[in-house]
Amino acid sequence: ELLRHGTNLLLTDPRRMGKTFWMRNFASQEAGFRCYFIDYEGVFTVHNFLINTADALIKERKLPERALTKLKTIFDNCDLEISPGPITLKTYHHQTSPHVLLTNVLTALDDDEDDAIPVVMMDEVPMAINNIADREGASAAEEVLQTLRALRQKTARVRWIVTGSVGFHHTLKKTNMTQGVLNDLESLRFGPLSNEEAKELAHRLLLGVGQDPNEAIIDK
């Protein structure tokens, strides 16, 4: 209901597991939303952040035609069936600020005229911001968070969910940023997983490591 009414969410629960599971579960079950899950684990530069964003949107294979057309003006290899290789920035955009391009990529979702509400699910953002600060400096990291905040203010239809296994407070302190870059997000704490959620998570984890997810093991 929060998302339907225009609230953007910051998943702040301290537990390391469950937030990503919740987002993927939400995306698969909730009608009326078109969800785009973006994982920023392993991102160390603003350019990486941009590429990860665009790549995830394209691979979802449910981008509205207008948004995909916009991405094709920025990147090569956007047609997965024709160009299976990684997307790359077009030559004439090599000198364009990646923060500007990030804005162009994500605002394209706001042009969707479908009834479904677009939801951008950004996972492991604190880790990426921390890595960018280490690699490119605190100002580059801060500009990413400022860009994302401006996007949340600018877009009318898009909803945003931001989370990560590393707390934002450590990242903000390290880069001398204030909570102001996040204060437009509503903090949502999960608390413990329900019994059914815990079983479903255990089931998926066992499948992920090639184990038989039988009930006896899961119940333990």
Q: For the regions a protein language model found, what residue spans apply to each?
A:
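C-terminal alpha-helical "lid" subdomain
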Residues: 103, 115-119, 210-211, 215, ...
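Sensor-1/coupling segment of RecA-like P-loop NTPase cores
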Residues: 118, 127-128, 137-176
